[in-house]
Every structure is written in C-alpha cells, then in structure tokens.
C-alpha cells in the first residue's frame, strides 16, 4: 500500500483511478455518476412564479449516497441558491432559494432517485437572503 502513495506523483492521469484506495475510487465513480445523471436530466419549461426560500430537512437513507452532491448539482442547474449539509443525526438539511416551481421540481427530482430513500421531508418557509450567489455543500 505504501508503494502506491510513493509512486502516485509519477502516475499518468488515466492511471489515477487505479491508484486510489477502493473507498476513494467508489466515491469518485459515484460522484461522476451523480454529475452525469444531473446533466442528462430533461428539465421542464418553468413559468417563473413566487420567489421564496425554504428550509428542508430530509430523513431516511440520505447520507453516504451522493445526496448532497446531487442536490447541489441540480439546484445549480435550476438556478437556485442556498446550501446543503449533513446533520449529526443522519438527516440532511438544506436552505433553497429561488422560484417556487423550480424548488418543487428539485424536491420531486430528489424523491425520484432510487438509491436515495427519503422517508420524511420537512419543508418550512424562511426569509429570502439578498445577494446570495450559488449553491454550496457545507
């Protein structure tokens, strides 16, 4: 194992994945899969409606499955702002800001994912933030 790290600086880019630890390799493949799924998802035509901010807490199988990355990628694609984070109790919490129809689509999209099992979703309104940019995983 030590030799892999010793020679790692000398490997070619296409060999990087093979030189990774198995868990890191799995995470990279999972993350690449998540990004690919979000990029190929067909988005509906949205009619811009109310601009809102929601605090959403997701319970179920939502950690260690690429949930935060998928939410962040899709929120960014939808032009939403905010953040998403893991909670110590195993839940995931997000604050999502943007047009209501886009937030509804994002939540429906997340519920549709097979590797994720949302057992409970608590959705509460909160005050919009001025000049917020981007969507972050924290």
What is each model feature region?
Residues 2-138:
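Intrinsically disordered, low-complexity, mixed-charge
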